[in-house]
Amino acid sequence: YAITGDERYRWLAEYFYHNDVIDPLKELRDDLGTKHTNTFIPKVIAEARNYELTQNETSKKLSEFFWHTMIDHHTFAPGCSSDKEHFFDPKKCSKHLTGYTGETCCTYNMLKLSRHLFCWTGDSSIADYYERALYNHILGQQDPETGMVTYFLPLLSGSHKLYSTKENSFWCCVGSGFE
């Protein structure tokens, strides 16, 4: 749609609208619960792009609401979010400092969403998050010797990073990490 302006493609994009994910965000409601984290972020990126193409204010507001909700309530100090790929009650954050904290795909996609929002607003807090997540998580998940990457950024005291291998592991986060 962005390239052609052909409404058929816009209709197709709307076909993928996920009511269970997007509708609570339209109501500015944090209904993330224990749902799969990276199921949400790409769908919100699509809403951000929808705003850019159609000037739909609802898409803009829900994108901004989601971003602030993530950063203010669901993000750890290095800029990562999730535990074992899922949201959790932010009031129980300390119970989610595990070896499976901080899925790289989530941070990578939050950086993509951040770029959209920063272009709209120029808000320096978005750039601050971007810098923190890029340097502490994205760059921090790369093995300095081999260049391989991690699936998670473990935050549990005493835990260690498990890096991908060149031949035997190709998780989703390997692709996001390299991208």
Q: Where are the language model's segments positioned?
A:
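Glycan-recognition and catalytic cores of secretory/periplasmic carbohydrate-active enzymes
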Residues: Y1-E179
